[in-house]
Regions:
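Transmembrane alpha-helices and adjacent helix-loop boundaries
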Residues: 1-217
Length: 217
């Protein structure tokens, strides 16, 4: 098999990895916000639900979570598994897993803002919403961006875990090609693609950090 054909097949697998990457961010970034506020809530049941959720998501392997979500409908409810079940379970597992990590990042960022800034904004006539949007959020965004960036870069590599439940992403394609062609070239090509994609993500995150440099702690 020629290198061109291998790259074409790996490219198709990469599109699946990219789709998983994008869907995970679109789902987990907003989901982490209410979880973070629950984690900081004065209502004890909400606070404990969030703490347990975050602890489970961070304390158990993502691969195990994928298997649990994939097989639970069958073993618990007797629902038959379909070919689409693998993809759905994979996306759901990635979203709820990363939401747990993002929630803790949001919480640490919000709690790092001195209480005096809220009080000063109130004296100046700002509403709670105005204080949050115009004073708190710009500072929080800058403070949490490096940690968010680390998780996003990790996500690029974690998409390869989808092969465990049979999702045809780039790593599973490379693994199949290595077995059929008896060659390490597919692994080398896929490693290069992962690195290039991560490099692009790092550049975008770096640009975002520079854009937020207008605020200095």
């Amino acid at each position: 098999m020629s290198i061109q054909v291998m790259m074409q097949m790996l490219g198709q697998g990469f599109l699946v990895s990219l789709q998983l990457f994008v869907l995970t961010l679109l789902g987990s970034i907003p989901l982490g916000i209410p979880v973070a506020f629950m984690r900081m809530s004065k209502i004890a049941p909400l606070r404990w639900i969030a703490r347990i959720y975050i602890s489970v998501m961070r304390g158990t392997p993502l691969m195990l979570q994928m298997f649990a979500i994939y097989f639970a409908p069958y073993y618990v409810f007797g629902i038959s598994l379909t070919p689409d079940s693998k993809w759905t379970a994979c996306v759901v597992a990635f979203i709820i897993n990363y939401a747990g990590y993002f929630a803790e990042i949001y919480r640490s960022g919000l709690q790092s803002i001195p209480r005096g800034q809220y009080e000063a904004a109130e004296v100046l006539g700002y509403s709670r919403m105005q204080t949050f949007l115009y004073i708190v959020m710009p500072q929080v965004a800058k403070r949490i961006l490096p940690a968010m960036g680390n998780e996003i870069i990790t996500l690029v590599k974690d998409t390869s875990l989808a092969f465990a439940i049979g999702v045809g992403e780039m790593f599973s394609t490379a693994k199949a090609l290595v077995a059929s062609q008896v060659s390490m070239v597919p692994f080398a090509i896929s490693a290069l693609i992962y690195w290039v994609f991560n490099f692009v993500v790092e550049m975008l995150l770096g640009a975002a950090e520079k854009k937020l440099d207008y605020y200095h702690d």
